[in-house]
Amino acid sequence: MGSCSIIMTAITEYKEIIGNGTTRKPHYLATREAFSIQDPPANSSEQTKAELLYLLQLQSTRSAEDVRSSMYFATVYYRVNTKPGDKDYTQMQRNLFHIGRSIAPWFCADSLPMTAALVANVWKDAAYLIWKYKNYFVRIRPYKLDTNLKNQEETNWAAYPSGHATNSYANAYLFSELLPEFATYFIKDAYDMAHSREIIGVHYPSDSESGRQLAKELINRLKLNSNFLSDLSKAKTEIHALKVKHGYP
């Protein structure tokens, strides 16, 4: 099968399953808000060729532990319509704090319910944007362009921007507003999440970078939203009280 046929087959498969993505609604954002996400590199571009070579290099050097941890990261997501009583509700709440999980035992949904609600609402906005632009760009997965890539996960939707990268960086930038002294840790966790998708061959580096940029623009945009700022203030108060309780400066 030629490369054009492979691309069209993959796009057809993808379009058959995106219906639920197109029905997502944001929480804080207005649906008509535009973001400055750039077009992905063309499939035949020199950048895409270079990124495919990079992914092949990652494939040749990745260890079993790299794959194991990356496949674990693949399970870290938030189902935006989750609710108390759902069998995965506890896990979804835990996933909200995957970024920054190492900074303190109290940095979790159980200890910070208002912060957890804020993060969940931001994930709704991020999910809306992710699917909006995945549906718009319909970028082919790297392993569909180069069959020498042995992807460790099968994904039947578009690559650009990376959902894991967008969500993780959105968390990182949001948490940096709440706990700026830990910003380096948050950004490192988000980078590791984004890079894990490259390690297992399902995302180009430009997918990760577009997700980072989209997340940064999202948080900056939300800082102009009065409802978000009100919820952010409540989360800051909640976190400050817990820091005082645990003897943090």
PLM region descriptions:
Residues 216-218:
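Catalytic phosphate/nucleotide-handling subdomain of diverse soluble enzymes
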Residues 234-249:
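Primarily interfacial, aromatic-capped hydrophobic alpha-helices that serve as membrane anchors
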Residues 6-200, 221-227, 231, 248:
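Hydrophobic alpha-helical bundle signature of multipass membrane enzymes
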Residues 203-206:
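Short acidic/histidine-rich active-site segments
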